[in-house]
From Swiss-Prot:
Known pathway: Cofactor biosynthesis; pyrroloquinoline quinone biosynthesis
Function description: Functions as a PqqA binding protein and presents PqqA to PqqE, in the pyrroloquinoline quinone (PQQ) biosynthetic pathway.
Keyword presence, Lyase: no
Gene responsible for this protein: pqqD
Family annotation (InterPro entries): PQQD, PqqD_bac, PqqD_sf
Species classification: Bacteria, Pseudomonadati, Pseudomonadota, Gammaproteobacteria, Moraxellales
Name of the molecule in the record: PqqA binding protein
Single Gene Ontology MF annotation: quinone binding
One example of a Gene Ontology biological process annotation: pyrroloquinoline quinone biosynthetic process
Subunit structure: Monomer. Interacts with PqqE.
Amino acid sequence: MNKEQFDVNLVPTWRQGYRFQFEPAQNGFVILYPEGMIKLNESAGAIGQYIDGKNNVSAIIAQLKQQFGDVAEIDNDVIDYMLVAQQQHWIDLV
């Protein structure tokens, strides 16, 4: 799937064994999984906070625009994140 074909009606969910949380020792958001930990940058952490198995990608984009303003890059950043997270097997898109 590429950016042009991406369906923003898909709902991202964290895959079994992966947990998103704020880690004070890392001073940021991380994804924990059995083999280790992934420290996320600020943008990825902001996106990850809205992955709850209920919000579709379109709703996540809308919430981020409400939080940060209608920044043109938000749409592309969220879709890029979803594609990478799916490719890395952090999330499922249903």
